[in-house]
């Protein structure tokens, strides 16, 4: 028994030389500028990115994965053409946030407030410091067809609508009304508000669990989160989580809630079985967040410190911090490209690439080691860590399949176009195979310095040629970055 315990301890220690380490791999990919002041950025799930430009530009700008502007949608509407017969003339909105329904077919955009019409219309607009039921003008949510990029319907909600979230079945769109201190429930088939739920001062962020039965709403003027049963519309509370909770994300298994606490400058992880909160400092005034599809990484924009922070959700540790343009306020994640889009309020959208890819193949090294005979490994010798690797590799039948020790690919050229970087070579091989099926002459390059295996789309002898190829690949929908071996 003692030998078995000693062997297990040795295995766990030895694996530290081989085991996966969280990689800090954020890099800036693109800056989009123009006539924009984005308050938020949202991904449709199908390669469209909607930026909401508030009353400063009165537009929604729509981009594709190649960073091309597809359309600038004006917030100018004729309300009488959308069922509001008493509203004559032209009106303007002020796009704030966006969510999607029906697998990305429709975008729903909130408008901070409305203007236009007669002098008596919209004469009591809400504001950031305004709150109270029945005092301020109601506003509207636009429904936009993502195929035509046209406004198809308009739904009246509360005062200063901000965040929106849809149920998984696309039956409801929920909207927080900042100044009227409540939540609107929109029936997407009836195209009208069917319920108004009183919440408290400054409701903001919303997340709906994957079952579609519960919605969580932050009350930014408090330290509480409302929990709403979407079958009965009754509410309960998670209390004392921290000051000014703003944005929410939820783990894939619905067991943890992530919240940005704007007043405390931290991000919290709430265990929903106990309501205990684990917190991490990310930067000044953390605002919006995005969660990777596997739930391992949280991306946080810090409005006061102009940074994008990457956090591992397992232990709530900061693993990367990268500078952004002024006032980052919105963020969205594209799990097809591993790109993070950041809305910077002062007038730009920044796109960052995270070269971390989730392992889809279990590391067989662990199982190979467990299969070995403990007595054959002399763990009594005090060897430096770098000397343990050859000893362990001698016990494994196929070490090259797990830890390649040579460069595979074209060693003559100096510039490589990288589509992905991996700790596990098998994952790199998987991506190379996928690229080859698409007609690319892809190959693997192993970097001895950082122990990453790169999936390369191409290699070039000059930087100018590499940039030209990179641009051509991006036009074809493949994001790459350049790696120089000089």
Predicted regions located by residue number:
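Short structural boundary motif marking the start of a folded domain
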Residues: 350, 413-416
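Predominantly soluble domains enriched in secretory-pathway, periplasmic, or organellar proteins
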Residues: 16-397
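Extracytoplasmic
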Residues: 36, 55-57, 93, 136-139, 391-413, 423-486, ...
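Sec-dependent N-terminal signal peptides
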Residues: 4-13
């Amino acid at each position: 028994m003692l030998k078995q315990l000693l062997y297990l301890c040795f295995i766990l220690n030895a694996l530290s030389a081989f085991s996966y380490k969280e990689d800090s791999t954020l890099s800036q990919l693109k800056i989009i500028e123009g006539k924009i002041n984005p308050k938020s950025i949202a991904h449709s799930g199908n390669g469209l990115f909607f930026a909401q430009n508030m009353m400063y530009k009165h537009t929604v700008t729509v981009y594709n994965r190649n960073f091309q502007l597809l359309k600038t949608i004006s917030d100018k509407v004729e309300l009488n053409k959308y069922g509001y017969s008493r509203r004559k003339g032209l009106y303007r909105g002020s796009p704030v946030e966006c969510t999607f329904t029906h697998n990305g077919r429709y975008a729903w955009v909130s408008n901070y407030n409305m203007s236009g019409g007669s002098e008596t219309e919209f004469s009591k607009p809400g504001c950031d410091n305004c709150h109270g039921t029945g005092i301020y003008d109601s506003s509207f949510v636009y429904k936009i067809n993502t195929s035509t990029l046209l406004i198809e319907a308009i739904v009246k909600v509360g005062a200063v609508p901000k965040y929106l979230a849809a149920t998984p079945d696309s039956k409801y769109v929920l909207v927080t009304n900042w100044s009227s201190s409540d939540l609107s429930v929109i029936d997407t088939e009836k195209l009208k508000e069917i319920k108004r739920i009183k919440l408290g001062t400054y409701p903001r962020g919303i997340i709906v669990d994957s079952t579609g039965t519960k919605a969580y709403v932050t009350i930014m003027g408090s330290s509480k989160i409302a929990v709403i049963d979407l079958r009965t519309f009754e509410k309960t509370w998670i209390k004392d989580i921290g000051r000014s909770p703003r944005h929410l994300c939820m783990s894939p298994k619905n067991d943890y809630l992530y919240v940005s606490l704007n007043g405390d400058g931290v991000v919290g992880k709430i265990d929903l079985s106990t309501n205990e909160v684990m917190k991490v400092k990310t930067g000044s005034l953390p605002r919006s967040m995005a969660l990777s599809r596997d739930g391992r990484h949280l991306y946080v924009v810090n409005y006061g410190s102009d940074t994008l922070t990457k956090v591992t959700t397992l232990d709530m540790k900061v693993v990367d911090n990268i500078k952004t343009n002024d006032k980052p306020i919105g963020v969205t994640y594209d799990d097809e490209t591993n790109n993070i889009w950041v809305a910077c309020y002062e007038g730009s959208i920044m796109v960052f690439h995270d070269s971390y890819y989730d392992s889809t193949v279990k590391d067989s090294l662990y199982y190979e080691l467990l299969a070995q005979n403990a007595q054959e490994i002399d763990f009594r010798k005090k060897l430096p860590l770098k000397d343990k690797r050859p000893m362990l590799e001698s016990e494994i039948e196929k070490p090259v399949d797990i830890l390649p020790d040579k460069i595979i690919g074209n060693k003559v050229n100096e510039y490589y176009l990288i589509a992905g970087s991996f700790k596990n070579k098998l994952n790199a091989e998987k991506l190379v195979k996928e690229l080859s099926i698409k007609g690319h002459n892809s190959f693997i390059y192993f970097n001895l310095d950082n122990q990453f295996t790169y999936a390369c789309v191409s290699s070039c002898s000059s930087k100018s040629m590499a940039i030209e190829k990179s641009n051509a690949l991006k036009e074809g929908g493949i994001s790459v970055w350049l790696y120089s071996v000089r």
